[in-house]
Amino acid sequence: MINELEKIFRQSHLDIVESFKNLESSNKAKLVLDKWKRPEGGGGTTFTIHGGNFFDNCAVNFSSIKGKRLPKAALGNSLIKSSNNGYQAMGVSVISHPKNPYVPSSHMNIRLFCILEKNGDVKEWWAGGGYDLTPFFPYKEDCLQWHNDAKDLLDTYNKNFYKKFAKNCNEYF
């Protein structure tokens, strides 16, 4: 199961990278792909664009790390307090700053934490993520569409999610 989930995360990363590369039609942009390894286990890929026609700066990151014990900060109420058999955590994050001030900056991330059994199977897991836009020149129509699209997506999982998450967001910000 965990290998299939990692494939999905990796493919999401690659799809976003390809979409962003297609927005940069000239050779003006500096595109950098950096693959890295973590000594304790796992690694990831960081893709950045600097000084392009569309993006001033952006980053699309993938990571999948493994370890023997989760850091205390990761042991929230939704996870068992012991990860004696190890863990695996993975995620994709995107940060974009377009050149056009009428196109909002954006951020999104998806993440998955798994506590493992002795045989490597998933014992318990926690998933999360979020996304936001920061418009410099907000348009009411764009804001409404963004919220409507978020609601439509969340409604496919639970009709109460949008109201709950919007409330959490408004309290946080």
Show the residue positions of the predicted features.
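Gly/Pro-rich turn-and-neighbor structural signature
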Residues: 1-80
